[in-house]
């Protein structure tokens, strides 16, 4: 039996049950869809899901997770392609508070609703940050700190048998995210660095964060 024959048979039976109904194949008020598998499934509404691939089918990667808007979205997007993620957060007390750390823990839990369980590594970055501040040119502080973060993240990634790093960087969004700056941070890594939101503008990232439910947590006023 063909799909056209199924349509004709089911359509006829529906019209028998509802004689006041009529068929309009061009502008229908209601479209009924039918899937025949082990059983017959009839439905009138299709709800779009996240799509993507089963978690873990494309290996594992390490997400550099902050309390901002971008990195949770990056983690979600790479997880949607079947990549299992772990995460690393750089905490710098007393310059960042315990509430800031809790915000990142909460974000990891929110992303984990889509990605499956996330192992979160919390790194005390204060001593390294102060050393860089004392010893390095101040106009290069951000890039140098970022290079240290990438090295540390790669250490945890290799321990966890991850196949790459994930960041929420987007070209030109801030001064430290020019192509030259991204190349400078890449230089310290031997693993590939994946940047799922690299071509997004800020509004596009914000919209995606609303969709996945991380936006309200990300904008909580705790420095990360």
Region annotations inferred by a language model:
Residues 171-173, 221-224:
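Small/polar glycine-rich anion-binding or flexible loop at a beta-alpha turn
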Residues 68:
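Conserved G/P- and acidic residue-centered "switch" motifs that form tight phosphate/ATP-binding loops
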Residues 84, 163, 215:
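Residue-level detector of anion-binding/catalytic polar loops
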Residues 1-62, 72-119, 126-127, 187:
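RNA-binding accessory domains that recognize and position tRNA/RNA substrates
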Residues 213-221:
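A short alpha-helix-loop-beta-strand transition element characteristic
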Residues 9-18, 46-58, 129, 135-207, ...:
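Active-site adenylate/phosphate-handling loop in enzymes that bind or generate adenylated species
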Residues 86-88, 195, 218:
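Short hydrophobic alpha-helical runs that function as membrane-insertion/retention elements
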């Amino acid at each position: 039996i063909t799909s056209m024959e199924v349509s004709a048979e089911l359509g006829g039976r529906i019209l028998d049950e509802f004689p006041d109904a009529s068929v309009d194949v061009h502008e229908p008020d209601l479209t009924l869809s039918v899937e025949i598998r082990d059983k017959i499934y009839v439905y009138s509404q299709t709800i779009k899901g996240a799509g993507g691939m089963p978690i873990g089918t494309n290996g594992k990667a390490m997400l550099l997770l902050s309390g901002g808007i971008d990195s949770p979205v990056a983690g979600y997007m790479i997880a949607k392609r079947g990549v299992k993620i772990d995460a690393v957060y750089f905490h710098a007390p007393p310059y960042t508070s315990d509430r800031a750390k809790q915000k990142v823990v909460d974000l990891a839990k929110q992303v984990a609703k889509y990605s499956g369980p996330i192992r979160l590594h919390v790194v005390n970055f204060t001593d390294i940050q102060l050393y860089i501040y004392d010893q390095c040119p101040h106009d290069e502080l951000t890039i140098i700190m970022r290079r240290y973060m990438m090295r540390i993240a790669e250490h945890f990634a290799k321990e966890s048998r991850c196949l790459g790093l994930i960041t929420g960087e987007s070209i030109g969004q801030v001064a430290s995210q020019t192509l030259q700056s991204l190349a400078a941070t890449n230089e310290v890594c031997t693993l590939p660095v994946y940047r799922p939101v690299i071509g997004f503008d800020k509004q596009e990232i914000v919209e995606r964060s609303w969709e996945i439910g991380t936006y309200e947590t990300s904008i909580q006023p705790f420095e990360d």
